[in-house]
From Swiss-Prot:
Membrane-traversing stretches: 13-33, 66-86, 101-123
Knockout mutant characteristics: Cells lacking this gene grow normally in minimal medium or in high-osmolarity environments, and exhibit the same survival capacity as the wild-type strain upon a drastic osmotic downshift. They sporulate and germinate normally. Combination with an MscL mutation enhances the osmosensitivity of MscL mutants subsequent to a hypo-osmotic shock.
Name of protein: Uncharacterized MscS family protein YkuT
Primary gene name: ykuT
Similarity comment text for this entry: Belongs to the MscS (TC 1.A.23) family.
Topological category with respect to the lipid bilayer: Multi-pass membrane protein
UniProt KW Iron-sulfur keyword: no
Keywords: Cell membrane, Membrane, Transmembrane, Transmembrane helix
Organism domain of life: Bacteria
Principal subcellular localisation of the protein: membrane
Function text: May play a role in resistance to osmotic downshock.
Stated induction or repression of this protein's expression: Expression is sigma B-dependent. Induced by high salt concentrations.
GO MF annotations in UniProt: mechanosensitive monoatomic ion channel activity
Length: 267
């Protein structure tokens, strides 16, 4: 009881109060610096986009990575400052981390592999945010490239998180022009030259109407020859991600042209 009475409770409460105030200020500064840093990074990359220094997809990819690096670095600095506030030597922690690192090194190989692979993906410009890609059994639009994972959203809305180390083969469908391909089945008894002429007329009209078409469309010729029907192939080169739209328009216009050229007999 004498110990309790003699203990400097006022000093303890004062020191604890000062410590809590300092901690609150540090937390407040952390969120202020984080908010300002995020805004500055986003503003800088927006400027790059306006000046056409970077493509939109490339700018979004690098912005996402820069934001991740900034966030992780800021958390580390905040953690070290908190340790220092409680009079714990951060260097001792870092020295201990080296020993612990040896123990968990094998377990961390995957993390290191993710980061290194992600770095080379960005360095070699294999993909950008907004690209349509196929990775292994997944395909979709790249939403984010991070330090550890790449996020791909499939066309059904599913968001896939793929560890960067698993991205060994990438098929990027958003680089350069893409090919629109339409196969048209027609009865074998029809005059082939007449059918090709009608199809090419549709192709020429569609090319004039759609600026997304970069070359063609052109009737390549007979793709398959059967006893009751033949298949005629039409091919066009389009802007990336526009090939499906061009194919749909071609099918619609070809159907309309056939309806006009070969009206059904009325009873």
């Amino acid at each position: 009881m004498d110990f309790i009475k003699q203990y400097d409770w006022a000093g303890l409460i004062t020191n604890a109060g000062v410590l809590l105030i300092k901690l609150a200020i540090m937390i407040l500064l952390y969120f202020i610096v984080r908010s300002l840093g995020m805004k500055i990074i986003k503003h800088l990359f927006a400027k790059f986009e306006e000046q056409n220094s970077l493509s939109i997809g490339r700018a979004h990819t690098l912005r996402s990575l820069t934001l991740n690096i900034f966030a992780y670095t800021l958390i580390f600095i905040f953690f070290v400052m908190v340790l220092d506030l409680f009079h714990y030597d951060p260097s001792a922690l870092l020295a201990g981390a080296g020993i612990v690192g040896l123990a968990v090194g094998f377990g961390a190989q995957g993390l290191v592999s993710d980061i290194v692979t992600g770095f080379f993906i960005l360095l070699e410009k294999q993909l950008d945010v907004g690209d349509y890609i196929t990775v292994s059994t997944f395909d979709g639009i790249v939403e984010q490239v991070g330090l550890r994972t790449t996020q791909i959203r499939s066309f059904d809305g599913t968001l896939h998180y793929i560890p960067n180390r698993n991205i060994t083969n990438v098929s990027n469908h958003s680089r350069g022009t893409m090919q629109a391909l339409v196969d048209i089945k027609v009865p074998a008894e029809r005059n082939i030259d007449e059918m090709i002429h009608i199809l090419q007329q549709v192709c020429d009209e569609t090319a004039a109407a759609l600026p997304q078409i970069k070359e063609g469309p052109n009737v390549i010729g007979i793709q398959e020859l059967g006893t009751s029907e033949i298949v005629i192939r039409v091919i066009a080169k389009t802007e990336n991600m526009e090939q499906w739209r061009v194919e749909r328009v071609l099918r619609k216009e070809i159907k309309n042209a056939f309806d006009r050229a070969f009206p059904k007999e009325t009873e």
